[in-house]
Amino acid sequence: MNNNTEKPSLLDRLRPNLIWIIFATLGWYMFIAAFGHFAWEGMMDAIKDHISPAMFFTLDMYAATIVDVITLFILCWFFKKNRYIWKSFMIKPASSGYAAGDILTEDDAYADLYGRRRNSFKMLGIGLLLGFLTNFFCIICALLHGDIKLYFDCAASQIPYFLFSLVCVCIQSSSEEMWCRGFMYERLHERYPLWVAVVVNGVLFGLLHIFNPGVSAIPIIGIIITGLSYSLLRWYCGNIWIAMGIHTGWNFTQNFLFGLPNSGLVSEASVFHLDAANAVSSIIYDWEFGVEGGIPALFIDALLGAIILYMAIKDGKIRELGMNRLQTLEAHGLKMRVEEAEPVAEAAPAEVVEEVHEDAAEKAEDVDSTTAE
């Protein structure tokens, strides 16, 4: 008896593995993005003497991450299987919805359920407000504890610069969210229960900051908790824009509004300025790493995650943490088909099968009549 079944290659056997997903993603990012950042640094060296130090900082530390967004775009569109991830970053107008009875591809169904149908500027705004409030809470704690002193020094002529900086910070924060709470999160959720995507995502997010200036154990633990909380927020709210917003609001508030270190990096210009000579470290504030090196930041992010879990338990959504992508879609009662096609109304599967059987029967009758003759 001939067995034509081919054994899966070593590459095929590795692909479902958690380690493969992680290292393949990081490898692609480092290989492709490295060329882009090399070119960006060359451009920055060429214009360094023609722009202010503040503008150089904004372009070099924040706007440069546009390279990471482009790298992710290439990854999502070069490999067709990843395109649904990029779709989940977009906004889908209400007028482009599907008709009743449509059967979607699994990718389109997921992109709609957790992405483009729920992404909105409203969610981005809510995220920005959350980012400001959570960071402001940590700054107030540091001020009341006497760890820092701030003074106001901002001219009206600087407002355009700060608005431009907000856009650049949004690019930087969104690029991290798109890679972590977007690509990595989605690829893990495709094969594993959601809790695996949340946990791995949070840990990797923390490890990505281990080379930041002034880093220590508490900031890394805090950033891991931040990654966990932002992953839960992205899941519970059903869109990534709110995560982009809270990340942007946090970074912009501490770096450009209050002039504090953002993960160890200090802006050249801000609305308020830190009296660095009198800043001290404590359990509330780290003079090198900023409020992210204190207990309040760890507490506020843990509280955010706890609130999300409480709300998920209360409305019964918590069960999704134990489901992979396909199981989640089935739990929501979405009809799916495997092949790619335009999202238009189709005949029911049973009718399609019946038509196929009728065609086969007609062909069989033609063959029988020909044989008889």
Segments (PLM) and residue ranges:
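Membrane-helix interface linkers and caps
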Residues: N2-L11, I32-I126, F132, C141-D153, ...
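Hydrophobic core of alpha-helical transmembrane segments in multi-pass integral membrane proteins
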Residues: T25-A33, D68-W77, G131-I139, L298-I313
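Functionally important transmembrane alpha-helices
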Residues: M30-E41, P219-I283
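Membrane-embedded alpha-helical segments of multi-pass membrane proteins
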Residues: Y62-T71, I159-L166, W179, I220-L228, ...
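Small-polar-interrupted transmembrane alpha-helices in polytopic inner-membrane proteins
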Residues: N135-F136, V169, P193-I210, I223-I224
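Membrane-interface helix caps and helix-loop-helix hairpins in membrane proteins
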Residues: D147-F152, H209-A217
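Membrane-interface helix/loop boundary segments of multi-pass membrane proteins
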Residues: S175-V200, L232-N239
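C-terminal membrane module of polytopic membrane proteins
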Residues: T253-E373
